[in-house]
Amino acid sequence: MELEKKGIELTLQRAHPFYKGIMLEEKLADLEKMKQKKLFSRISLSNAKASQEIDLESAIKEEANSDALYVEFESLEESKQLDVVLHLLRDRFLYCLYCGCHYDSQEDLIENCPGINEEDHE
């Protein structure tokens, strides 16, 4: 991720709900890859190690689900999630996804961007 290149660690607690879903999927995918690697290398897991992996997976899911904002964001329809992300980009970062550009100020964004939705840019 871009933040990691700058030396900033992005944790589930600090991430926007949109990124929490992505980060959660990555953690679970990494855990699954680790399980598959052990399975294919024919290294048998002891009951203790298997239990630790199950506990880790449960902890990852529990951590994500304990955040009310994340749970609320994930419960939205995809179109509503997109609206949240588009507004966040505009309000916090002065960026329009459809223009593909960063603006110098809120006034610059209002003057030069036709709107928040894709239809506004046609």
From Swiss-Prot:
PANTHER family: G PATCH DOMAIN-CONTAINING PROTEIN 11 (PTHR21032:SF0). It comes from the Eukaryota. Pfam families: DUF4187 (PF13821). This is Uncharacterized protein C6F6.19. GO terms for cellular component: nucleus. It comes from Schizosaccharomyces pombe (strain 972 / ATCC 24843). One of its GO terms (molecular function) is RNA binding.
